Amino acid sequence: MPSASKNFRLQSKYVFLTYPKCSSQRDDLFQFLWEKLTPFLIFFLGVASELHQDGTTHYHALIQLDKKPCIRDPSFFDFEGNHPNIQPARNSKQVLDYISKDGDIKTRGDFRDHKVSPRKSDARWRTIIQTATSKEEYLDMIKEEFPHEWATKLQWLEYSANKLFPPQPEQYVSPFTESDLRCHEDLHNWRETHLYHVSIDAYTFIHPVSYDQAQSDLEWMADLTRMREGLGSDTPASTSADQLVPERPPGLEVSGDTTTGTGPSTSPTTMNTPPIISSTTSPSSSSHCGSN
């Protein structure tokens, strides 16, 4: 049984009740309602049963009174431990058609074809919603038609306005000019000198070597590129993870009188021989100092 509520109040001559999963008898419920509502001068009462999909029985009741009640007790219509859903019947004809669809209905009295007309304020609100073309116009129309609501419920009205007229995202305008975003020359030179165009991780995907070896390979390629192009050590070199890696000139295999070591070769043969370019050989797989 529901607890008493200070907010409950029923003031309608036309009432629609639904008793869900009710094990009572229909005729007993009908008699209970008739006796309970007699002081309000019953004009019509109809009670119908409905077999629900889960096998339980629902009871519906349409009540039409000649005298408007003022019921504050939410348990007023409770019957044998069953509490109904209570709501005003705004269209009695629709309610009667609904509850009598299964044909099992008991009635008493003269039915009134009653229908509650929409309030004039609802029509005014509908006009505002349908005719406003922007958020500003919507709020201005409400301010004109319903000044009290505008003054006391502006926060909720702005919320509904944003739902009707979603704000368009503003186009981003960068606070920086194009010249501000250009790389300064000293930073550009530092980047080209100290940073590779390919990361060490990307290099190891193509050349299966260790991290340290990959770093050494990239440094060697950068130095070699500068040397071949006659550039200084502070001049940027182009490196790529999948570029062709030059083999280091072999040692004794080139010439019988070639001197090996870290110093430059004095053999005319090796000095005039161009570097051998290989797509499969990396610095990590060839000797950095030649053959011993």
UniProtKB/Swiss-Prot annotation:
Biological process (GO) annotations held by this record are: DNA replication; symbiont-mediated perturbation of host cell cycle G1/S transition checkpoint
Residues forming the catalytic site: 98
Motif RCR-1, which positions? 16-19
Q: Does the keyword Kinase apply?
A: no
Disordered: where is this region? 230-292
* Keywords, ordered alphabetically: Activator, Covalent protein-DNA linkage, DNA replication, DNA-binding, Endonuclease, G1/S host cell cycle checkpoint dysregulation by virus, Host cytoplasm, Host nucleus, Host-virus interaction, Hydrolase, Metal-binding, Modulation of host cell cycle by virus, Nuclease, Nucleotide-binding, Nucleotidyltransferase, Repressor, Transferase
Which cofactor is essential here?
Answer: Mg(2+); Mn(2+)
Consequence of mutating residue 185 to Q? 95% loss of ability to bind RBR. Reduced replication efficiency
Give the Low complexity compositional bias ranges.
255-292
Record-given protein name: Replication-associated protein A
Q: Where is this motif: RCR-2?
A: 58-60
Impact when changing residue 212 to Q = In strain: Mild
Family classification? Belongs to the geminiviridae Rep protein family.
Q: Where does a divalent metal cation bind?
A: 50, 58, 60, 102
